[in-house]
Amino acid sequence: MSKVYELVSEYQPSGDQPTAIKQLLEGLDAGLAHQTLLGVTGSGKTFTLANVIAQAQRPAILLAPNKTLAAQLYGEMKSFFPNNAVEYFVSYYDYYQPEAYVPTTDTFIEKDASVNAHIEQMRLSATKALLERKDAIIVASVSAIYGLGDPESYLQMMLHLRRGDVIDQRDMLRRLAELQYSRNDVAFERGQFRVRGEVIDIFPAESDQDAVRVEMFDDEVDCISVFDPLTGVVKQRDLPRYTIYPKTHYVTPRDRILEAIESIKVELEVRKKQLLENNKLIEEQRISQRTQFDIEMMNELGFCSGIENYSRYLSGRSEGEPPPTLFDYLPHDGLLIIDESHVTVPQIGAMYKGDRSRKETLVEFGFRLPSALDNRPLKFEEFESLAPQTIFVSATPGNYELEKSAGEIADQVVRPTGLLDPILEVRPVATQVDDLLSEIRIRAAKEERVLVTTLTKRMAEDLTEYLHEHDVRVRYLHSDIDTVERVEIIRDLRLGEFDVLVGINLLREGLDMPEVSLVAILDADKEGFLRSERSLIQTIGRAARNIEGKAILYADNITKSMKKAMDETNRRREKQQAYNEKMGITPQALKRNIKDIMELGDITKSKRQRNTKQVPLSKVAEPSQTYEVMSPQQLEKEISRLEAAMYQHAQDLEFELAAEKRDEIEKLRAQFIANS
């Protein structure tokens, strides 16, 4: 059998990786429903998973706990499988305010959302890859458990074009309109089509680089070509066939919509009767008015605002049945890999309950029909029943994963680089701040970085202020900072803009930096969420990528959580040392390129190919001395160019590069004022 998954890497599995790969593959072959990969920070878990996918030759969905981690994982998988369909599936909302009602103040909040068109295209591309190709790898966030269009309706709505087909041009344009494509003969954009005589150009919704040209000869499809929508250059000509996918996952055939409308009318009458019997006259009038308006819109346009609330009827499902999700698109032999499972699994369980309470209020007060409750994410039990063979991945697996895996745990403790887990020390709380200050000075002198985690926001602020007063270059990472700023702060820490980062919950994944040689945990003996065994292990692991890695736990007592965390860290360290001695390995310091700290994948490969070669981070613009001799007009032009590049990087989720461009723009603006 020819291999469809082709792993491309200059590295070979080493350390604990070969054993973990072998164990996971044997478990898959044996039909095990659940396995766990216990992989420490920096042990190459992603490379292990890539090897498992390549050797198993099976499509996979990789679930990550947030968009940032999903994008990192996507970038890594894209580099390991450049010739396969690695796709990205996360929530496409830049901003989302769900429909809600607050009874105490009689306030109704309309649904409001801002959709990221680029991520919407990637979602469509992901489902297309699952339907068309045998080599799909989908990196997704927990939004994958939310309702998606029914695969059967989606497949029914496709427009199949074949050379030689006889089809009236008007019929083709009507079919495109049914797929929710709009006609635009002026500005040709994704999800649109244009008509020029007997030539119809279609920009597929799932593509960011190719458009399709259909040339007609009277009522016959004469030629199908693929061309670049930007330059007009034809890439492929005389294709025998081409399939146009719907613009959205939520398209529904006309006959299904008409059936749904009849069912909605029946439910409306039942609901109105219930409300009148309970003397809820306002609610009865409200539900009648809102539903009748939606029915009119669906009759005339084929959709309405909030059409997802009628998904039970549109997908033909019974009351209480799980909604169609991304898992319905996954082939029967697919794999599910849950990254950072100690965070992701609880998220999956929490989604349904939060959504349900909001919708029950809307139903009770007549804003929605009871069937709207079936527009929901999967319940945890439904997720369990739908999930294919699953591999949990974490440095600190939760009780659920350990219980489900029933001892099938692949231990990946030894790092290929030979790096050891940090040395642990426990010091008294009474002198923790002064002791920390002296430790920081030692690290700063060696140009190393320090992470400090506190228990409260107040303490973090006070400590930051204290360190600042003592001439320590320090920053404070708090919950109000968004993803982009967070990436920027991490980059600045690695670049040496400051030496110490203080925070409350610094165990969030993605904070792995080789420059960090010390992690200080203040008040480590205060039992609780932030000082649990898993939290402590995760926090200690932030120093695991440095050859001089050390963790200091400030505590007056050794709690159960501390003891377990210290025992586990020491167990790992002993195993790593024994392996290094046996194999004659000398630990090597990681020298990870700064620009790669949050490299979120080559998300728009085509755009990169069209652009000039990637500019190194240190040379994102010309040297400042060149700007000094520029005229104001030249500076203005250069600022515009950099702004365009900055927005492009932000759209492509390359926050690192966007931040660099922004810094350069600020310098230019200062120079512009000076030169004016």
Swiss-Prot record:
Which Pfam families would you find in this protein's record?
A: Helicase_C, ResIII, UVR, UvrB, UvrB_inter
Q: Does the keyword S-adenosyl-L-methionine apply?
A: no
Q: Binding of ATP: at which residues?
A: 39-46
Cited InterPro entries: Helicase/UvrB_N, Helicase_ATP-bd, Helicase_C-like, P-loop_NTPase, UVR_dom, UVR_dom_sf, UvrB, UvrB_inter
Molecular-function GO terms, alphabetical: ATP binding; ATP hydrolysis activity; DNA binding; excinuclease ABC activity
Position of motif Beta-hairpin?
Answer: 92-115
Regions that span the bilayer: none
Where mainly found?
cytoplasm
Q: Which keywords does the record carry?
A: ATP-binding, Cytoplasm, DNA damage, DNA excision, DNA repair, Excision nuclease, Nucleotide-binding, SOS response
Q: Which residues form the Helicase ATP-binding domain?
A: 26-414
Q: Which GO terms describe its cellular component?
A: cytoplasm; excinuclease repair complex
Q: Please provide the record's free-text comment about the domains of this protein.
A: The beta-hairpin motif is involved in DNA binding.
Q: Could you give the subunit structure recorded for this chain?
A: Forms a heterotetramer with UvrA during the search for lesions. Interacts with UvrC in an incision complex.
Q: What does this protein do?
A: The UvrABC repair system catalyzes the recognition and processing of DNA lesions. A damage recognition complex composed of 2 UvrA and 2 UvrB subunits scans DNA for abnormalities. Upon binding of the UvrA(2)B(2) complex to a putative damaged site, the DNA wraps around one UvrB monomer. DNA wrap is dependent on ATP binding by UvrB and probably causes local melting of the DNA helix, facilitating insertion of UvrB beta-hairpin between the DNA strands. Then UvrB probes one DNA strand for the presence of a lesion.
Q: What is this protein called?
A: UvrABC system protein B
